[in-house]
Amino acid sequence: MSDLLSRTHAIALDAADPLRPLRNEFLIPRHGGGEQTYFVGNSLGLQPRGAQAAVQEVMKQWGELAVEGHFTGPTQWLSYHRLVSAQLARVVGALPSEVVAMNTLSVNLHLMMVSFYRPTAQRPVILMEAGAFPTDRHAVEAQIRFHGFDPAECLVEVQPDEANGTISLTAIERAIAEHGPRLALVLWPGVQYRTGQAFDLDAITRAARLQGARIGFDLAHSVGNLPLRLHDVAPDFAVWCHYKYLNSGPGAVAGAFVHERHHRDTTLPRFAGWWGHEEATRFQMAPQFTPAIGAEGWQLSNPPILGLAPLRASLDLFERAGMEALRSKSLALTGMLEALVRARLSGVLDIITPAEPQRRGCQLSLRVIGGRERGRALFEHLRGIGVLGDWREPDVIRISPTPLYNRYLDVHHFVEEVEAWAGL
């Protein structure tokens, strides 16, 4: 085995890692007498140490100011959601006016489709990937039915055409072109949740717009994982959650993007609520709705301040690190994991995530050779010894080395434990 795949080399890489201090900014779950080896940042990110202080700041302000906290104090709640806008915009490559933290992903997806899925008899079709995360498919079917159409006729799913269940860009572009005259909306993920495949958002956007279709992205597994350029790529909308790579806690407030070309479009339908009304006249309580300019205009209710506080703490860490530095470390971490699996576990694990670094984020999806029961046995064994990935039916273990807090030694430890389990 190459020295570059040795435990000694992993320790040396950790010692030289410029992002190493950021691990200390997180609470690492305990296991036995030590720390858990945690590879589930793609499902629920670890708690930033600053999250509790951020929440306590809000609690203190509530206790001391009560309702006046909306308008006074160091972080008045009237504009609290804007405290995250600039940092969040840098994470997703957008203008601050194009992003808003609000609701949850499924709610935001429905709100965006109210505005950007406008089917007609000639253009009723939504195109998405086969095997999409269930909430996306549920929402799409519900929207199609809401407009009086039949999902059996108006939902097109692009099937995998590559080994291991991934989808080529050629297949996506071909499907968009084939259904183009009937396409109302293309809804696509930035990263496919089960396979870990990352997609070329530029190319998909171009293909959709060439056919006159709207384009939106579910970036649940992309935000905080991959550098994004939403303003330049210019989809109509995007939605995502903040509890994965953005480390904002279970059920965290989610995020949405609306490109600036739509900000002053008064013909665009939307579901309205009072917090989406322009701030200057909101408290005049007029019956007419005047939307705020920007993504803020899609807000409904006043934001949950206690839910936004942990997001502030996490975004501060992203500011310290920078997305390019995080991506650089992520490539190295996941590259080491791939190399070790291929060198030492080729008879135990199959990697179903694309091998090309530009076609994946930090996640590797692994299928245990020997079938589902053997795979589940390995997953439970690893969990029992404090090495935590996650399981996705029917037979995939997802391992996601997250550069904010995972180490090269964590990757090496995972491979050693699988070797021991397999008796290698």
Curated annotation (Swiss-Prot):
Cofactor: pyridoxal 5'-phosphate
A Gene Ontology molecular function term of the record: kynureninase activity
Gene Ontology cellular-component annotations: cytoplasm
Binding, pyridoxal 5'-phosphate: 105-106, 133-136, 218, 221, 243, 274, 302
Alphabetical GO biological process terms: anthranilate metabolic process; L-kynurenine catabolic process; L-tryptophan catabolic process to kynurenine; NAD biosynthetic process; quinolinate biosynthetic process
Record keywords, A-Z: Hydrolase, Pyridine nucleotide biosynthesis, Pyridoxal phosphate
Family (UniProt): Belongs to the kynureninase family.
The name this protein goes by in its record: Kynureninase
